[in-house]
């Protein structure tokens, strides 16, 4: 099966890694819109325009399913992606919300995602009596993309972001941006051990597996097989090294422009 997914940068690697583990023997096309990183501080209209361009590009790739590996686009433009692609679309926010069991939930997300209250609304739809508090984290994505992950700086920033949530005595914490699982160790240093970390990619991966299983009866016996194609809109030189670091693959990466019709296939 041919599966597409995208993010503004390397955050979607956290989704791709879990999906590959649970759903091997498929082809994956990963698009990183690095030219417009980060998405989390963009306006609603900007994100909607990006969603139009991304869905148009993926239609050209003839994929069978699509994973929204960017929470900001998920929160603002999921309807656009679903309408334009006309194939099964799997999203992080809805997937995570449907699994929540705790009564007091914190969410770390980008400013644009928090502004929509997408996580709050999705969780309350499944569990109306849940207390949800969302915290915008504008500094995280730039720090992660600059590989500033294991420093005291990011722990200090995390401490500041988490304090309002800890004061509300949350039971679980949703990592509401696909970049954030990359700094889970730093977050865990600040969080009490009783607080459960929730990566939405886990629920999304499970839903994708159910879909693939329902459509595919014959799997290759080679469980290590995976076909990966990577595309970026800028920073072509550095992206293979990032893929090697986080995914343990050193792929060929193609440069594309989402504003032009002369796409690389």
Curated annotation (Swiss-Prot):
What keywords are annotated for this sequence in UniProt? Cell shape, Cell wall biogenesis/degradation, Isomerase, Peptidoglycan synthesis
**Pathway this chain belongs to:** Cell wall biogenesis; peptidoglycan biosynthesis
- Which residues does the Swiss-Prot or TrEMBL record annotate as the active site? 70 (proton donor/acceptor), 177 (proton donor/acceptor)
Annotated InterPro entries: Asp/Glu/hydantoin_racemase, Asp/Glu_race, Glu_race
Q: Where does substrate bind?
A: 7-8, 39-40, 71-72
> Which reaction(s) does its UniProt entry say it catalyses?
L-glutamate = D-glutamate
| Stated name of the protein | Glutamate racemase
């Amino acid at each position: 099966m041919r599966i597409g997914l995208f993010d503004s940068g390397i955050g979607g690697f956290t989704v791709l890694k879990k999906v590959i583990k649970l759903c091997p023997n498929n082809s994956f096309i990963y698009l990183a819109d690095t030219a417009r990183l980060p998405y989390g501080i963009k306006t609603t209209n900007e994100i909607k325009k990006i969603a139009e361009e991304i869905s148009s590009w993926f239609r050209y790739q003839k994929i069978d399913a699509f994973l929204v590996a960017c929470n900001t686009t998920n929160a603002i433009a999921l309807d656009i992606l679903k309408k334009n692609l006309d194939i099964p679309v799997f999203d992080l926010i809805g997937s995570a919300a449907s699994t929540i069991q705790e009564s007091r939930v914190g969410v770390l997300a980008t400013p644009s995602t928090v502004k929509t209250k997408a996580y709050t609304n999705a969780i309350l739809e499944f569990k109306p009596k849940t207390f949800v508090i969302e915290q915008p984290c504008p500094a995280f994505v730039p720090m992660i993309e600059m590989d500033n992950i294991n420093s005291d700086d990011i722990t200090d920033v995390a401490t500041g972001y988490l304090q309002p949530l800890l004061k509300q005595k949350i039971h679980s914490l949703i990592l509401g941006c696909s970049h954030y699982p990359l700094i889970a160790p730093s977050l865990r240093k600040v969080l009490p051990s009783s607080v459960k970390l929730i990566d939405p990619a886990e629920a999304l991966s499970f839903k994708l597996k159910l879909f693939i299983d329902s459509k595919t009866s014959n799997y290759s016996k080679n469980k290590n097989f995976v076909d990966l194609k990577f595309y970026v809109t800028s920073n072509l030189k550095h992206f293979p090294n990032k893929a090697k670091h986080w995914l343990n693959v050193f792929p060929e990466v193609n440069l594309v422009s989402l504003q032009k019709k002369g796409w690389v296939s």
